[in-house]
Amino acid sequence: MDPYKHRPSSSFNGPLWSTNSGAPVWNNNNSLTVGSRGPILLEDYHLVEKLANFDRERIPERVVHARGASAKGFFEVTHDITHLTCADFLRAPGVQTPVIVRFSTVIHERGSPETLRDPRGFAIKFYTREGNWDLVGNNFPVFFIRDGMKFPDMVHSLKPNPKSHVQENWRILDFFSHHPESLHMFTFLFDDIGIPADYRHMDGSGVNTYTLVNRAGKSHYVKFHWKPTCGVKSLLDDEAVTVGGTNHSHATQDLYDSIAAGNFPEWKLFIQTIDPDHEDRFDFDPLDVTKTWPEDIVPLQPVGRMVLNRNIDNFFSENEQLAFCPGIIVPGIYYSDDKLLQTRIFSYSDTQRHRLGPNYLLLPPNAPKCAHHNNHYDGFMNFMHRDEEVDYFPSRYDPAKHAPRYPIPSATLTGRREKVVIAKENNFKQPGERYRSWDPARQDRFIKRWIDALSDPRLTHEIRSIWLSYWSQADRSLGQKLASRLSAKPSM
């Protein structure tokens, strides 16, 4: 399959300067004026077009994941999992699928340093024979909240103060003091791995729970995990200050330079699976995005490898206009009832339509590389050439028909309409276990970062007390150490 077969044809590489409409431009240095010192004439079409295009070069930046870098490569199946899924691109070991990957920071603006303590986005678009599959995740396997209803509020709290445009800890800790399920995510974010050394040396995770479906219709919950073959490397706080002060685009440059030099980044893909019939056997809800699945009871299973061996050709076209959505799936991979995933299915495509327009899936990096057909017509910036006379379905004049049916999860759901928190919250067990797995020096660095955050002068005694209570419930000694060090600070 040629991943570039369906790129729009163009002739912009001509040897002579021209307008957007192709007319020759014999002088691209001087405006048209009345005499050598007279006023500029509005009839200078090339000048007006040049300025008008420049005025519109920038598009709205992503609300989150604005700062990012992309690269292209392939995914290769190494292990047979056809007993779990009928996905065509996973049909046999050795099968390769073209991919494009975008790494990103999450909260900060497009030009912000890549050394800030922030989750990292890890999104992959697979160009399969049955359409695109977007696996849109992060470098951490869990998330702050479990219900997408809180996503806008969460992002607002993490973003800069709307009055001062300064990110402030009191706002962050105030919001999350209402959400103890966030503790697990904070054991990743405030840990030593909270600032990846670069994009090549970090894990990836699908974060949400998805569903694999095999040809017989049997379903399994699944979590996706990427492990870099070159290992995980992170920056400690003082190292991040040094690196960021030297080059605020260090991770983007590292990715680009490594690929250009032939040092291709590679990740192994693993999955964890749970039979939905067995989901009640655990002390956590498998659909709770704030939980990990313990590897000792839900082991990792190898699937394949991903190699990034080609840099993008144009940053704007293949990074800024690159768009992902968890709703874009292929036969054999389906959603779950994970509440955060359910809201992401709508929100991601909606924000892309706002940012790029209703025809964003026609843009080259977003369009499928396989043949496709529907009656989704027109709209702003529709550049697909079509010559059909029939734009409805069904029709006896159009041979297009339904695709063959493929299996999807068939579980029967019953229940009342209600807005409730899941039954198995269990917010403190996994954060405590993760903290206790670290050596004393790593624990101490985690505590120091929390002391710095809890020392924000605008943080109230009530909010500090709530956080001390939360961390004490996760690990008694952790809560005691935080309380002791806070009480020793003069400002406390």
Curated annotation (Swiss-Prot):
Positions of heme binding: R62, R102, F151, R344, Y348, R355
List of residues that carry Phosphotyrosine: Y210
pH dependence, record text: Optimum pH is 7.
PTM annotation: Activated by STRK1-mediated phosphorylation at Tyr-210 upon salt and oxidative stress.
Protein name in the entry: Catalase isozyme C
Effect of gene knockout: Impaired catalase activity in leaves. Accumulation of hydrogen peroxide (H(2)O(2)) in leaves, which consequently promotes nitric oxide (NO) production via the activation of nitrate reductase, thus leading to subsequent NO-mediated leaf cell death, as well as increased S-nitrosylation of specific proteins including glyceraldehyde 3-phosphate dehydrogenase and thioredoxin. Leaf bleaching and cell death; these phenotypes are reversed by melatonin treatment. Increased tolerance to zinc oxide nanoparticles (ZnO NPs).
Temperature-activity profile: Optimum temperature is 30 degrees Celsius.
Expression across tissues: Highly expressed in mature leaves. Mainly expressed in leaf blades, stems, panicles, leaf sheaths, and culms, but barely in roots.
Span of the annotated motif Peroxisome targeting signal: 484-492
Gene Ontology annotations for the cellular component aspect, listed alphabetically: cytoplasm; glyoxysome; peroxisome; plasma membrane
Coiled-coil ranges from the UniProt annotation: none
Family assignment from sequence similarity: Belongs to the catalase family.
Taxonomic lineage of the native organism: Eukaryota, Viridiplantae, Streptophyta, Embryophyta, Tracheophyta
Entry annotated with the keyword Oxidoreductase: yes
